[in-house]
Amino acid sequence: MIIKPRIKGFVCITSHPSGCLENVRQQAELALHTNLPEGNCPKRVLVLGASTGYGLASRISAAFSCKAQTLGVSFERGPKEEKPASAGYYNIAAFQKLAREHGLVAEDINGDAFSDECKNEVIEKAKQMGGEFDLVIYSLASPRRTDPTDGQTYRACLKPVGMIYKNKTLDTDRKEVKEVTINPATEEEISHTCLLYTSPSPRD
């Protein structure tokens, strides 16, 4: 497959496995040279939202600086015949490769972290890894969540509250500076965005 960049506004929405590997490798190299005192290091870490951003960086730090066992939970799209996978998918593959090279214990679950099925799988993996986690990183950025107790689906949005947002943006495709306007969120959108990250059951 030949991967070509696809630009939306000023964001490249096409990921490349080699680029993701290099990104994760650079972070791991930095973490390897930042060894923390043994007493300050977690031994077993659960990362909810482990494929990009703060979650991925926290996992890399725990694994390569502290030699911690890590379990990552993420929901990423794999590759298709003529379409590459998401960046998060390649990031996880890169992390697994580097973890194996350094003899680290690293497990992953690709699934909906809000679902009962995924929670049960985390519990089983935790048992296999030796028990409770002494550090939990919560770094989920999901656009929607279905509450397993009643089937209600909540959808998040990124909009201003109580005012119209206006600013300039760069369209790299057309090489133009444009004005962008975003209308304020409705009461329903605000409610859904807040409820998306509210625990749906006492077990959470």
Q: Which sequence ranges carry the predicted segments?
A:
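Conserved small/polar residues in nucleotide/adenosyl-binding loops
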Residues: 197-204
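Rossmann-fold cofactor-recognition segment
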Residues: 99-115
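Canonical Rossmann dinucleotide-binding motif of NAD(H)/NADP(H)-dependent dehydrogenases/reductases
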Residues: 43-71
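Class I SAM-dependent methyltransferase Rossmann-like catalytic core
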Residues: 3-32
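A glycine-rich helix->loop->beta "capping" turn
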Residues: 104, 121-150
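Short, flexible helix-coil linker/hinge segments at the edges of structured domains or between repeats
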Residues: 148-194
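The beta1-alpha1 cofactor-binding region of Rossmann-like NAD(H)/NADP(H)-dependent oxidoreductases
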Residues: 111-122, 196
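Glycine-rich phosphate-binding loop and adjoining beta1-alpha1-beta2 segment
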Residues: 75-104
